[in-house]
Regions:
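Regulatory and interdomain segments flanking nucleotide-handling catalytic cores
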Residues: 1-125
Length: 125
């Protein structure tokens, strides 16, 4: 079963330089991907999709969790992701602008990230 991962930049609207932040995120993600063993590599690497969101697909939950942990530990101060993980079938829907990822795995990941976001909104800064 595939594992869908959504990553959302925490506080992206408050970042002083969103463009520079994305460059740093891209570099950190590339570093983590290079350093992970082949057995933990994503099937589809973590890449931006829209706004401050990114998506990846992993073969196992172990691989997804290892990637997420390493990514969080590698991010510099001031940059943070929140994650949603969904386990289940995923597929692509053809579009004139490229394939769109869809399916129960993505729906579960979206539901998970929505729960995390709602809980973070209720915390004291």
């Amino acid at each position: 079963m595939t594992v869908a991962v959504l990553a959302d930049i925490v506080g992206s609207r408050r970042l002083p330089d969103r463009v520079a932040a994305q460059r740093v995120l891209d570099e950190v993600i590339a570093t983590v991907e290079r350093e992970l063993p082949a057995s933990l590599q994503p099937i589809h690497p973590l890449r931006p999709t829209t706004g401050d969101e990114q998506q990846a697909v992993f073969a196992t939950l172990e691989a997804a969790l290892a990637f997420i942990l390493q990514l969080q530990l590698t991010l510099p101060d001031g940059l943070e992701f929140r994650f949603g993980i969904g386990i289940g079938p995923i597929g692509a829907v053809a579009s004139s602008s490229g394939d769109l990822m869809d399916g129960p795995g993505w729906w579960a990941a979206r539901a998970a990230i929505d729960v995390v976001h709602a809980k973070q909104q209720r915390t004291i800064p």
